[in-house]
Amino acid sequence: MLKKAVYNREDFLKLNNLPQRLRIWAEDTELEDYIRDEAFYHRALPRKAPMALEPLKVAVVGSGPAGLGCADQLNRLGYDVTVFERDDRPGGLLMYGVPNIKLPKDLLMEKINDLQARGVKFVLGWELNAPEDFDKLQKDFAAVVLCVGSRKEKNLPGIEVDNKQIFHAKDFLTEVTKDMLNGTEYANLKGKDVVIIGGGDTGVDCAAIALAQGANTVHQLERQECDATANSVRDNLCNIVQGDFTIKYGTQMKRLIRDEEGKLKAVETVQVEWRSERAGALPDALPVLGSEKLLRAQVLILALGFKGPEDEIFEA
C-alpha cells in the first residue's frame, strides 16, 4: 500500500501491477517534449508579419493552451499583453487538466516565466462572469481575445455531483494538482474502490491518478467497443487491453447503489450491444439482458467530456 500519492513519471512506472495501457500512457512524452522544445520560443518572425506600430494593450481572457499561444504571438508582434486567469495559477488545462505525471508543472512554469520575462503580464483570480467585467476590459484595452475553452461538463441524468464521492473529472484532476503544488499531497483515494465513467483521454488520466493514489480497485467504463473508440488504432490498444480488468468496453452504468446512510457503495453495470432497432436507424447502445454486474465503489468520477463554454461567458 502506498504511503503517499505518486505524481511523477519515474515513480509511477515503478508501481506494482500497472496495466500496460497506463504504462504506455505514462511513457508517452509527446506533450512534455513539445512544451519543452517547441512552445513559446522567441523565433524570428516572417517578413510580412503585421507588427504593431505602437504597443497597443490587448487583453487575453484565459491562460490555457489557446490563451498562452495567443499571448505569445501578440507579444512577438509588439503588443502589450495582459492575460486574465480565474485560477490561482496560469496554465489552464495544461496546469490543472493534465496530471503532473504526463506534464511536469515545473516545466510549464518555466515557459510561463519566460513569457513574463518578455513582458506578458498575468492577472490571477479574475473571472469574466458579468457584463460590467467585459465592459471594463473593452474600456481599458484596445482589443480583447476570449480563450476560455470548453469547461461546461456533460452530466448523467439523475447523478448529482457532490465532490465527496461523486466528481467531475476536471474538478478531481484540478484538486489533485493543487494538493501536489501546495505541498499537501495526500492519497485521498487510498484503499478505495473507484469507478470512472468515460473511456477517453481524461478518463485515462483519472484512472492513472487513482492508481497513483493507491486505490484498491479501479474500473473505467466505456459504452463503445474498443475498436470504435478514437484511440483504438493507437499503440495497438485493443490487443493491449485484452484481459485488462481496469477498463470495460461495451459497458455502461445502470444505477448507483447506496448504503443505509445514503453513501455510495456500488455501481451496477450492464453490457451493451450497438445495433439498430429498425431499418435505416442509427445504431444505439442497447442493454444485454442478464449481463448486469456490481462493482464496489466509494468514488465515482464522471469523465464524459464537455458541452462548450460556460453560460456566464455568453451572458457577459
Task: Map each language-model feature to its residues.
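Beta1-alpha1 glycine-rich phosphate/pyrophosphate-binding loop at the start
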Residues: 3-9, 13-16, 24-25, 56-128, ...
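Helix-enriched interaction subdomains in cytosolic or periplasmic regions
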Residues: 10-38, 144, 148-150, 156-162
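Active-site glycine-centered loops adjacent to acidic/histidine catalytic or metal-binding residues
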Residues: 198
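Short microdomains enriched in Cys/His and/or Lys/Arg
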Residues: 2-7, 29-48, 53
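A Rossmann-like FAD-binding core segment of flavoenzymes
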Residues: 106-154, 171, 176-184, 189, ...
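A short, basic/flexible loop-to-alpha-helix module at the beginning of a structural domain
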Residues: 40-58, 174-192
